């Protein structure tokens, strides 16, 4: 059986980490692409030379031309500028929008049947623009945000309760920014909702509020610690989980930035919601019931994304809202 082909557009910290993780899982042959000459080739060779030690059999190549992504089954986009201390994700918009236009054109020409995962920030606006620029069906273009934000939420909860991360389910709605909505009511420990655990004395409302805020600030916390860049291990793991669900048709329920077509009262916008990912891409959007507080927080998050998309349209007139 022919091996799958996975193209990684952007060979920085996330791109290199993605290549290594995908290699270890043997999900398919890998093409690392970057505009910087030598960077994708060097990383591809370095990771390939680890394969005899780690015992994985895949082909790894590096390239500076979009022709190399031709026929890719999955494309993961990390190209663009990363955050530095003091920057918000939104500060990157103007620069990275131009990058998305180039990437979208490359995908449209060489890999129009691919499943595309965008990681570039500001995420919700960039994946919206990338889908427009590429012309791919909306169900085949998604943004990686919710899996990462939910993972951070789950990790912080596991630390608070001192229990296995495997027993915690939690997810985050909305945009990938300061207005994201970690859903406390829908988060559980072995099926026990967080509000019930507060009643049982496991934690307090104040501590849960602190964890929610730390989740919102999760990316900024790492940026301030690293000082020279942003997170790359957890974002890469999150994107691999999404790619694997598509390639293996596991129909996993994952929170991703997906284009909505009336769900949650929203049309033609990418926002973080739980979806089913399988061989068809986004096979179903799960519309959960929100109370008044959750609705209000979600609407605030959606409005923040809407403003970013308006800015994108002003900067690139060929984008239509």
Curated annotation (Swiss-Prot):
InterPro entries: L-lactate/malate_DH, Lactate/malate_DH_C, Lactate/malate_DH_N, Lactate_DH/Glyco_Ohase_4_C, Malate_DH_type3, NAD(P)-bd_dom_sf. It is an enzyme of class 1 (oxidoreductase). Transmembrane segments: none annotated. GO terms for biological process: lactate metabolic process; tricarboxylic acid cycle. The keyword Oxidoreductase applies. Keywords: NAD, Oxidoreductase, Tricarboxylic acid cycle. Its EC number is 1.1.1.37. The keyword Oxidoreductase applies. It holds the Pfam family Ldh_1_N. GO terms for molecular function: L-lactate dehydrogenase activity; L-malate dehydrogenase (NAD+) activity. NAD(+) binds at residues 10-15, 34, 96, 119-121. The active site is at residue 176. Belongs to the LDH/MDH superfamily. MDH type 3 family. HAMAP family: Malate_dehydrog_3. Catalyzes the reversible oxidation of malate to oxaloacetate. This is Malate dehydrogenase. It comes from Bartonella bacilliformis (strain ATCC 35685 / KC583 / Herrer 020/F12,63). The lineage of its organism: Bacteria, Pseudomonadati, Pseudomonadota, Alphaproteobacteria, Hyphomicrobiales. The gene is mdh.
């Amino acid at each position: 059986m022919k091996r799958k082909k996975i193209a990684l557009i952007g060979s920085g910290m996330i791109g290199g980490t993605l290549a290594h993780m995908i290699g270890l899982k043997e999900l398919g042959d890998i093409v690392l692409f970057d505009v910087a000459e030598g960077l994708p080739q060097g990383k591809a060779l370095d990771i390939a030379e680890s394969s005899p030690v780690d015992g994985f059999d895949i082909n790894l190549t590096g390239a500076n031309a979009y022709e190399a992504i031709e026929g890719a089954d999955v494309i993961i986009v990390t190209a663009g500028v990363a955050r530095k201390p003091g920057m918000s994700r939104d500060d990157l918009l103007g620069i990275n929008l131009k990058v998305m236009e180039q990437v979208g054109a490359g995908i449209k020409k060489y890999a129009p049947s691919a499943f595309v995962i965008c990681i570039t920030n500001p995420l919700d606006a960039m994946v919206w623009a990338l889908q427009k620029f590429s012309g791919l069906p909306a169900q085949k273009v998604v943004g990686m945000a919710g899996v990462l934000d939910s993972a951070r939420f789950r990790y912080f909860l596991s630390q608070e309760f001192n229990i296995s991360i495997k027993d915690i389910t939690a997810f985050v709605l909305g945009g990938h920014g300061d207005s994201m909505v970690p859903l406390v009511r829908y988060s559980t420990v072995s099926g026990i909702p967080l509000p019930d655990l507060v009643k049982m004395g496991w934690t307090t409302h104040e501590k849960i509020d602190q964890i929610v805020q730390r989740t919102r600030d999760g990316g900024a916390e790492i940026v301030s610690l690293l000082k020279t860049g942003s997170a790359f291990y957890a974002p890469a793991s999150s994107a691999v989980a999404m790619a694997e669900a598509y390639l293996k048709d596991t129909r996993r329920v994952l929170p991703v930035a997906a284009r909505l077509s009336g769900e949650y009262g929203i049309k033609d916008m990418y926002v973080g919601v739980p979806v089913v990912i399988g061989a068809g891409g986004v096979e179903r959007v799960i519309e959960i019931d929100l109370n008044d507080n959750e609705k209000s927080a979600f609407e605030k998050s959606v409005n923040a994304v809407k403003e970013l998309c308006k800015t994108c349209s002003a900067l690139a007139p060929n984008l239509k809202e």
